[in-house]
Amino acid sequence: MPRKGPVKKREILPDPVYNDKVVAKLINKVMYDGKKSIAQKIVYGAFDIIREKTGKDPLEVLEAALNNVMPVLEVRPRRVGGATYQVPIEVAPDRRLSLGIRWLVEYARERKDKRTMKEKLAAEIMDAANNTGGAVKKKEDTHRMAEANRAFAHYRW
């Protein structure tokens, strides 16, 4: 906890092609070892595949995918008198977006069906837009956990 007041959030620059901050965050999440140009090729390649297969604007498909993946509730552990309870809490908007992007990239990497990361990412985004895929399942599991632990909601802080 800083002594000089709250920490300011860094302003992220929009990506060069679509001029969109969400796409820039997606590129940063795909990036390994600071190799941004490779991450950009992967994301833009995935967008080309999405445009080819769906005939829609890739940004619209990404928006739909993120809306289906972003969690509304999650559980946080809270110690009360020697017992640890999983307390359901609402997810802040910034965290919702970052979790949604993280899960999309994570489950795209885990896919076994496609050969290249472009294809995997495109497939995961299209699946998420259609309410299927690993990332959507992760969101549903998170919501199920929150629902199961609803009895401990009064321990919120």
UniProtKB/Swiss-Prot annotation:
Arranged from A to Z, the UniProt key words for this protein are:
Ribonucleoprotein, Ribosomal protein, RNA-binding, rRNA-binding, tRNA-binding
Q: Which GO terms describe its biological process?
A: translation
The family annotation for this protein states: Belongs to the universal ribosomal protein uS7 family.
This entry carries the following GO cellular component terms, namely: small ribosomal subunit
Q: Which Gene3D superfamilies match?
A: Ribosomal protein S7 domain
The protein's name in its UniProt record: Small ribosomal subunit protein uS7
Q: How does the record describe its quaternary structure? A: Part of the 30S ribosomal subunit. Contacts proteins S9 and S11.
**Keyword Cell cycle carried by entry:** no
Q: What species is given as this protein's source?
A: Caldicellulosiruptor bescii (strain ATCC BAA-1888 / DSM 6725 / KCTC 15123 / Z-1320)
Main function? One of the primary rRNA binding proteins, it binds directly to 16S rRNA where it nucleates assembly of the head domain of the 30S subunit. Is located at the subunit interface close to the decoding center, probably blocks exit of the E-site tRNA.
Q: Does the keyword DNA damage apply?
A: no
| PROSITE patterns listed in its UniProt record | RIBOSOMAL_S7
Q: Which Pfam families match?
A: Ribosomal_S7
Can you name one GO molecular function term for this protein? Answer: rRNA binding
